[in-house]
Amino acid sequence: MTLAIEMKDVMKSFNEKTALRNVNIEVKQGEIFGFLGPSGSGKTTTVKILTSQLLHSVGTVRVLGKDITGPSSIDYKRIGILTDNSGLYERLSIYDNLLLFCDLYDCKKERIDEVLAQVNLLDDKKTPVKKLSKGMKQRVTLARAILHKPDILFLDEPTSALDPVNVQNIHKILKDLNKEGTTIFLTTHNMDEAETLCNRIAFLCSGEIVALDTPENLRLRYAKDQIQVVLKDKKKETVQKDELGAKRISEWMKKGELLSIHSYEPTLGDIFIEVTGRGL
């Protein structure tokens, strides 16, 4: 198994505050790995450490087999980054923003139109960035991040400003990139997004990883022996798979109040709340 990312016993402190505590992650090459947690949990700090924008306090960090010890530790031609501080040149057009990075990455210029078409911005390529909406800027930043077909793509809340249609399109782009071999490290607080994209996910709370597995295994691990019923007034009830539960269902059926019966499977959101005691 070849690892794209390794974090061993990583800690990060800012003065008296500990932002990350004993973080251990191994991300395989070709994997889409989700890092889930609420605002302030340490997701962005982790991305900054992995992309050499911030130095960890304790532990070992490796990206593409190289120890991360400072800005010169990482080959930026092999990674793509989308974060809140992935700045664009406001006075330049969309096309010229990407052209600058095309030169840095030694890409063919034809690749610019290709990625702009993917993010539905080809018709706007001459528009200055300062005239774009927040969602359009986010798509430009993604286009820039995938311009050179990186080995690893780091995405910090990549669809937070997008409408559902563009979210669906971005998800397709990411899946296609992954099929071509790109490893993706994705931070999000959107459980549906994690479910759609990720091979494995880690739950981060207050700087600590509290669960890590595939979405399927997490659901199985935290599944309860319960059934969910829907009554005529659209009210949902959850009952145990036991004698008392069977009796309650029988009573609803006799009264003609029962509409449907469903097996109960926890969502990732349910599991996160159970593990951490808080929501996203």
Task: Please provide the spans of the model-predicted regions.
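Short, charged/small-residue-rich alpha-helical element at the C-terminal edge
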Residues: 217-280
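Catalytic Walker B motif of ABC-type/P-loop ATPase nucleotide-binding domains
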Residues: 153-157
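Conserved ABC ATPase "signature" region
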Residues: 99, 103, 109-125
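Conserved ABC transporter NBD signature motif
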Residues: 59-70, 74-75
